[in-house]
Design a protein with these regions (language model features):
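Hydrophobic core of transmembrane alpha-helices in multi-pass small-molecule transporters
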Residues: 25-27, 95, 106-122
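Helix-breaking motifs and short loop linkers at transmembrane-helix boundaries and internal kinks
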Residues: 48, 80, 101-106, 136
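Extracytoplasmic
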Residues: 13-56, 72, 157-161
Length: 165
């Protein structure tokens, strides 16, 4: 008797999933992790805040991501992943829109915490889990490519965002 892997090869479509995941991770993690660094000097100049205060905006997003990952991973186990990721992308977009209108430090802290907790966390953990599900063998390579997107986004997003200033 043949095993499933011998009779039906894994679909090529799985590499589309890996590529799309890498792109989504690049955009979301690039924005939450390093994207805010581009706006530090404009925030210093506009509001007169101290470096530590402005840096805490980034920290609040990362803390939100760390805590939210636990909850969003669990939700992704019970909900179709595409809905969780769509929700996360929408939250990040709305939080960035809100941040463009914010004029108090606490508003930035709150918006970036929410963007991390409900946004980036709803993208990171579910996408990584989803990529792994598409591979019976070679999951390590696929996960490496997907997470490389995250690293490229963290390095490249500041340059892209600098064009907006």
């Amino acid at each position: 008797m043949n095993s499933i892997s011998e009779t039906s090869p894994e679909p090529i479509y799985r590499w589309v999933i890996v590529s799309a995941s890498a792109l989504m991770l690049a955009l979301s993690m690039g924005m939450i992790v390093n994207g805010t660094s581009v706006f530090f000097i404009p925030l210093f100049d506009e509001f007169g805040w101290q470096r530590g205060e402005v840096s805490l905006i980034n920290t609040s997003g990362l803390v939100g991501l760390a805590i939210g990952g636990i909850f969003m991973g669990r939700i992704a186990d019970k909900t179709p992943i595409h809905w969780v990721v769509l929700f996360g992308a929408t939250v990040i977009g709305l939080c960035m829109l809100g941040a463009s209108q914010a004029d108090a430090l606490w508003q930035f802290y709150l918006l970036f915490f929410i963007a991390g907790f409900l946004g980036a966390a709803a993208i990171f953990a579910p996408l990584i889990a989803n990529v792994g599900r598409w591979f019976k063998t070679g999951a390590g390579l696929a996960l490496g490519i997907a997470t490389a997107g995250q690293a490229l986004g963290q390095g490249g997003m500041p340059y892209v965002l600098a064009l907006l200033i």
